Structures are given as structure tokens and as C-alpha cells.
Amino acid sequence: FSYFDEHYDNLPEVICLLKGNMIGRHCSREFFEQVYDNKTFTFLYDEKQYWDRFSKYNENKEKNEIGTTFLAMENVYVEKNNSWYVDSPNHPKKYFNDVDDLLRFIYKDPMIPQYCMFSPGACFIVRREQISKHSREFYRNLNKIMNYAMDPSFPSEAHQIERILPIIFTSLCEVNDWMDDEAAFEAKLPECSAYIQYKWENRPRRFKKLRKMLGLI
């Protein structure tokens, strides 16, 4: 979001949000060449090799079982909102346990979705008015949520924000006041770390009574 911050007053009408490895990993060159000149909000994602698994019917015309992931259309990936990735040791979390907590921190009264509709890799074509619906401070604060460390890799919060980008760019929900105020945000964010620690210390554990008796906890 640094580009949004640095060029907030003179953003181009349409922006492509890309990754260096997008072509070949998240979409084909053929797909990108067909859509790169779009002037509307576009998911830059296209993996036809998964159509057979994620569509309603497979190549044998048999109905697929509904799983935790599927395609809403050819370039819109949908994933059950279970934040399965947050316990990865390669992407540790500091502020938010899951997408639900993140949405509640950003918005005053968010609708918590059962599924997240997003573009894997966070690659989109987005319009200026979608970006400017939020303040410059809003994007600075989002950066603080997901760019605080690379130990050993980017944090879990980056995965979480990847999944809510369509919400950020399209939702009409009102954001919390601290999202538009850097000082208030920096005063509020440590509460999230304390909450993470509390939930970890009070997480359900097997054989808790036995462990306590043995002096292990």
C-alpha cells in the first residue's frame, strides 16, 4: 500500500496490482493479455488446471462435492473462512488470530463471511475511486499490520489481508476511527498483541488436568 500512500493525490484512473511471479503462478500470459486493459475491478487469477476440481462438475460430468475451496467463476477463487494458514511457523502472527478478528479491528460492524472471495497472490485491476474511498492514513496503517517483520517470512496478517482485499476495495461498512488516525492506531494495535497472548495461554489443550498435576503447566 506504499504506492497508494505516496501517490494518493495523483493516482492514475486504473491501477494493476501485480507480483513479479504472477504470470505462470497465478494466471497465464494469455489471460493477462486479454484483461490487462480492463477499466473495471478485475481479479487477476486464472488457473484452468483446477477447473475440473473446483467447478460444479468434473470432466466426466459428475457433480463435485462441495469442499472448502471452489471457483465462483473462472477467475474468482473462493475459500472457506477458517484461517487455516495462521498456525504456520513460516508465517507467524502478532496481532490477529484470524480474518474475523482483523475485520472487526478495521470495521465498526463488519459482516463476517463464511467464505472469502479473493484473488490468490493479491493481484487485481482496481480503480482510483476504489482506493480513494479510504484515507492515506488507512493504507499506512494497513502496512503496519502486515509489514512488521520477515521472520522467517512475511507474517500471517499478510495472508489475512490478501483474503479481504475485495472487501477493502468494495465494502460500504464504516471503518473504525483509529484506521484513519496513525497515533490512535499505534495506541490501539498493542491491545491486539495482548489479546493474541491471552488466547494462546487459554487455548484448549488435551490432558490439561494431567499436565497440571505433573507440573508441566
Where are these regions (language model features)?
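ER/Golgi luminal nucleotide-sugar-dependent glycosyltransferases, focusing on the catalytic module
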Residues: 1-217
